[in-house]
Curated annotation (Swiss-Prot):
Purpose of the protein: Catalyzes a reversible aldol reaction between acetaldehyde and D-glyceraldehyde 3-phosphate to generate 2-deoxy-D-ribose 5-phosphate.
EC id: 4.1.2.4
Organism: Natronomonas pharaonis (strain ATCC 35678 / DSM 2160 / CIP 103997 / JCM 8858 / NBRC 14720 / NCIMB 2260 / Gabara) (Halobacterium pharaonis)
Pfam families given in the database record: DeoC (PF01791)
Protein name per UniProt: Deoxyribose-phosphate aldolase
Keyword Cytoplasm annotated: yes
Catalysed reactions listed for this entry: 2-deoxy-D-ribose 5-phosphate = D-glyceraldehyde 3-phosphate + acetaldehyde
HAMAP family for the chain: DeoC_type1
UniProt keyword annotations, A-Z: Cytoplasm, Lyase, Schiff base
One GO MF term: deoxyribose-phosphate aldolase activity
Record SUPFAM superfamilies: Aldolase
Length: 215
């Protein structure tokens, strides 16, 4: 893998509650410079699309807890797509999953996927799930025609190799949460991840070493 290909698999992310317009612009500037994607809060998508039209723009819905009403998530997804998002990361309702209401979880993902003509990544919040719950979440997302699985929001724990390995059995995986270095990113790619979400995107790409991908 060369540096450009590597950078294109990084979603440079700014999603904290304190995020200001200047923070978003800084992420977009870095994404444009390094050839990364950018993941920004829904309220900034339209401005971000205008500011950096050549950057692949990712946003979120139902973030970060996943407890919005299903209709609210679907509407939010449609709204951010219309504002310019190229991809959408949606948080599942972890409580419903853990409570055994799998039909509701599947139906919700289906409704969000149907609401937009762009790839939807399903955030399963793996740090909060047992091994069996994680597999159930992956199965539901695959059944609902999601494009990707995403490990976590980063608010409740970090991505792990074990979770990525499991998730990669079902769909392409975006690893997110606690990935702050090139070495950590390589570990996730080696585990089966296809994308990385990280606030340290620029630092990760700065550390690129092609030898890490030589076989």
């Amino acid at each position: 893998m060369d540096r450009d290909t590597f950078a294109a698999r990084i979603d440079h992310t700014v999603l904290g509650p304190e995020t200001a317009p200047g923070d978003v612009e800084a992420v977009l500037d870095a994404a444009a410079e390094y050839g990364m994607n950018a993941c920004v809060p829904p309220c900034y998508v339209e401005a971000a699309s205008d500011y950096a039209p050549d950057v692949t723009l990712v946003s979120v819905c139902g973030f970060p807890h996943g407890q919005h009403a299903t209709e609210t998530k679907a509407t939010e997804a449609e709204t951010v797509w219309q504002a310019g998002a190229d991809e959408i990361d949606v948080v599942i309702n972890v409580g419903r999953l853990r409570g055994g209401d799998t039909d509701a979880v599947r139906a919700e993902i289906e409704q969000v996927v149907a609401a937009v003509p762009v790839p939807v990544k399903v955030i399963v919040e793996a740090p909060l799930l047992s091994a069996s719950e994680l597999r159930t979440a992956c199965e539901l997302a695959a059944d609902a025609d999601a494009a990707y699985l995403k490990t976590a929001t980063g608010f409740n724990g970090d991505a792990t190799v074990a979770a990525v390995e499991t998730m990669a059995e079902y769909l392409p995986v975006k690893a997110s949460g606690g990935i702050g270095s090139f070495e950590a990113a390589v570990e996730m790619f080696d585990a089966g991840a296809d994308r990385i979400g990280a606030s340290a995107g620029a630092a990760i790409v700065d550390g690129f070493d092609p030898a890490a991908f030589e076989t």
